[in-house]
Amino acid sequence: MKTNVIIDGDACPVVNSVIELTKGTGIFVTILRSFSHFSQQIQPEHVKIVYVDDGPDAVDYKIVELASNNDIVITQDYGLASLLIDKVHTVMHHKGNIYHSNNIQSLLNQRYLNAQIRRRGGRHKGPPPFTTEDRLKFEHAFRKIINQI
């Protein structure tokens, strides 16, 4: 069974890393984006871009539809990750963290608490900027996963 890397691609900073690391491996890459992120950039043969309608969660629904048990999904969306943990081989964050059934609930709880703070007009600290160190951590974790497949 072939392996696909499915990327929640509208704001993913590791797309180019994934494309490079999968070259010549037999692993295919599917990048999902909304039409508002349309690009005519030519991709390598092992890369396919799927565009979906703009709208809340449209990309997420398409990822759930396309994903299968041998796939690797890259997303920063905890809700999407929770739907995929038991469906695919691996779900990972673009900073290299792997989502598991033992860590997803605390991430969802934190997301809920942050949403409550925002609804009350409050503010909370957002994520720090993506760094070179984050990219290297992701690439190391991603290499480990694709070497296991």
Curated annotation (Swiss-Prot):
Q: Which family does it belong to?
A: Belongs to the UPF0178 family.
HAMAP family in alphabetical order = UPF0178
Q: Which InterPro entries match?
A: UPF0178
Q: Which domain of life is it from?
A: Bacteria
Q: Which organism is it from?
A: Staphylococcus epidermidis (strain ATCC 35984 / DSM 28319 / BCRC 17069 / CCUG 31568 / BM 3577 / RP62A)
Q: Which NCBIfam families match?
A: PRK00124.1
Q: Name the chain's protein.
A: UPF0178 protein SERP0336
